[in-house]
């Protein structure tokens, strides 16, 4: 009887230790996922100059550092026990080209390297790449223009305007047609465009594993800001 009681005490003690260890990991996990991350912000038109080049021509995405530099990424809500917080990730690893003829945007493609998107937590970045976005299998996301867009009315005086673009957005290997209004700014030799594109991750086949302490909301945003210059 004594031996049996001793075994029960040992088993009970081990169970308590395991439970306490798991409880101790919960705040650690929350701290890893609950930071706001790194978001791609909108256009900063402060100090913008009048356009110094014609809008027609071949334009390419530039990744030169500085104000309104090219960036793309995501923003989603993380659903924590009793709380809801936003988390963003971004990258400057973006390529793209656009063609404007007679004041009409006739062709355009933008490619984002998903494997280089970062938040502000290395552990979270690794989990997002491997377990959510599966970047080894789907390393790129793209937007391809499918309808011409009138850009002839964009202001030339260094103030921002808007342009509506329609195209195929492909994430996780799955394309969806979207129509989105972009803010656009002609300043000096550059054109800057920005939008926060609402998406439902399930439309792109992006599932999330069953996290212990947090889940990711279905609805979120693709944040994109492109700095374009004339093709040399």
Describe the function of each predicted region:
Residues 2-232:
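Low-complexity, acidic/polar, glycine-enriched regions of mature
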